[in-house]
A protein has these predicted regions:
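Active-site hotspot residues in diverse enzymes, especially metal/ion-binding acidic/histidine motifs
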Residues: 1-231
Length: 231
């Protein structure tokens, strides 16, 4: 599906607007953990269901699907078996992103099955522009910039961390220790705890911190499970 380019700033504003609209409807201030399921059902007016999408689409790489005409977001129920809460919630937020950003493009070009036109989220399409946009929306929705920056000041420092080393280079017992790449799961966990991001994975958190320029990784080693801790 071809979709127009949208800037990060525009996507972030749409996520903020959705939270603010939900706050007005619900009558209380929303803080992390962001109640994405309630937002989908109450603010967007969609039905959220869980099905075995592998059987529906005949493929094991489908995480979710957004049916525009029937106003349904469907999440692969197998995520309950094989994934963390963070992955499940992020997928819900991702599909909400498709609804907010892309539903107007489905009528003509949407992929169809028995339920009508749908936007189908597949692992194999992860690098496609439409999937990147939905991923970025999900990150902005679950980890609002204001709350992230507040938590970062509590956990880390007023200024961004510049990371120059993959491993700890300071001798044990030294008072000062520079941040290093292999420390990222602990930084992410501390951020999730300090900011109340209990439904966000450590991997999603560390990506968000780098995107906002709060962690600047100057090494060639990525901050992820596969690269940092490979055998």
């Amino acid at each position: 599906m071809k979709i127009p380019w949208i800037s990060k700033e525009q996507i972030a504003l749409k996520a903020v607007d959705l939270i603010e609209n939900f706050q007005t409807m619900a009558g209380y201030m929303v803080k992390p953990p962001i109640p994405v399921e309630d937002i989908i059902e109450r603010s967007l007016g969609l039905r959220l269901v869980y099905e075995d999408l592998g059987k529906v689409f005949g493929s094991n790489d489908v995480l979710g699907a957004t049916y525009v005409a029937s106003k349904v977001i469907c999440i692969n129920e197998r995520l309950f078996e094989h994934s963390s809460e963070g992955r499940l919630v992020f997928t819900c937020a991702h599909e909400a992103g498709h609804w907010v950003l892309h539903r107007q493009h489905v009528d003509v070009e949407g992929r169809r099955n028995l339920k009508g036109a749908a936007i189908v989220s597949r692992l194999s399409d992860a690098k496609a522009p439409i999937e990147w946009q939905a991923n970025y929306f999900a990150a902005c929705l679950l980890m609002p910039e204001k709350e992230i920056r507040e938590a970062f000041q509590k956990v880390c420092a007023p200024e961004p961390f510049v990371i120059n080393n993959v491993r700890n280079t300071v001798e044990e017992g030294a008072r000062c220790e520079e941040p290093f790449v292999e420390q990222w799961p602990f930084i992410a966990a501390a951020m999730c705890e300090a900011g109340g991001f209990s439904n966000v994975s450590k991997q999603a958190m560390i990506i968000r911190l780098q995107d906002l320029g709060l962690l600047i990784n100057q090494t060639s080693t990525k901050m992820d499970w596969k690269t940092t801790f490979r055998a």
